[in-house]
Amino acid sequence: MTRVEDLRRFLREKDLAAFIFPSTDPHCGEYIPAHWQARQWISGFNGSAGTAVVTADDAALWTDSRYFIAAEQQLQGTPFRLMKDGMQGTPTIAQWLCSTLPSGSRVGMDGWVNTIDSVRSLERELDASGIGIDLSLDPCSQLWTERPTVPDNPVVLHPIEFSGEESSHKLQRLRHALSALGADGTVVSQLDEVAWLMNLRGSDVHCNPVFVSYLLVTMQRAILFVNPAKLGDDVREYLAGQGVETMPYADLPHALQEYREGSVLLDTSSTNCNILSYLPKTCRIVEHPSVVSPMKAVKNETEIRGFRQAMLRDGVAMVKFLRWLVPAVQAGGETEMSIDRKLYSLRASQPLFRDISFDTIAGYAAHGAIVHYEATPSTDASLMPRGFLLLDSGAQYQDGTTDITRTIALGPLTDRERTDYTLVLRGHIRLAMARFPEGACGTQLDVLARYAMWQHGINYLHGTGHGVGSYLNVHEGPHQIRMNYKPAPLRAGMTVTDEPGNHYTECSYFKRKLSIKNNPYQKKDEKHSFPPCYICHI
């Protein structure tokens, strides 16, 4: 693999023993523009999560359980071996490097695409073995000769009729939260947080209506760092009216060096190392989780109304698709990719449709057990009138984002398939019917979705539910429903999915969108519930 060979020459020239490629960009998001997909470029693995490490004579890729099957297939014939992250017997990256490299070695990482927390954690472990970290190098700028450019698509307004709150008021709320935490400002680097605060949308990231930018907010100023060519006159006028200045994207380092406020809040779990390094040493760093994330997660009345309207239209498209599907399969000729195109066309005919919210997962038979499977011309399976079809899909409408999964029986099922389907459905219903007190976290509710399967010795390794943006990213925090995750209270106005699964057979999972609201009949007891937002039969 010439890319790995070229990288090893680079390592020798720079006196580095290894280089680490994470699955992040300078904004530390889940989905990243092609310009920063360095891990995929060096390894060939295209999953959304994973870390590649290359040394002078070895190469390995760590990824989680969602991608074990896909990674094994995609890494065949490459220098990389698969490390099944989180599984017993799999070393961490730090353990592997400490056992592989001699004391005095230096490991390279690009400071722009590695978070403060991830580097600190690795640094502590490597330091014990006398191994250092160099954050100053980016081999891709030299070796990636056909590297895609940084996206420069236009930025558009997200009108008040869909956002429900002016940007100036969101900034006022943000400043109040910062003041309460003893911070004079903050750097917002997550693209969905910038887009939400500014009431702007873009198309720089596949399936996510965001744009490449940073936002620096102090008590007196708000500065949006973005390529000026992306902004039309209407956007400039809107920002000026909201009290927001604009500067070129590349000017952020200089602005940070000139930062004269006493303190700045940084979410070290989602802020890259270089942002911290450019701030003056006299600046006090307030390390705290993002205060924008929980603000964004609690939807206002306009956003909730938009969610319901978007899901109603999406439900119409889904019901039309399901009515078409079984007769079409019985007639023959349909494949995973052809039904994907059909569903896209039905969604695209709905008002306010803008895009899909993630690449559709249409997995027939064994493909349904591959988490985040995506059909390609070489894997495109023909659909037969038997067994299960997993269909996980969603759309971006200007008034809301959708995400729905259905596991569809295309014909006769085995007894095992019926049992598995029933267990997953029982978990889905048990969670959907939950009543819970104010302050409960997703980690406490997760067992409801798993209980029926646990009684049969079955478990699934992925999360059960995630938040969903409002015409933004389909995955949103800080709240989630899963076993192992930092707790975040579920609050009225949040949206969350309900998607238990069984990937031991072709029966996979169901999913529907739920919102969280106070139960009006039990409000005095502060009870909450999950009223369904999505209308589509199971």
Task: Kindly give the residue locations of the regions a language model identified.
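Active-site neighborhoods and metal-handling regions in enzymes and metal-associated proteins
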Residues: 1-538
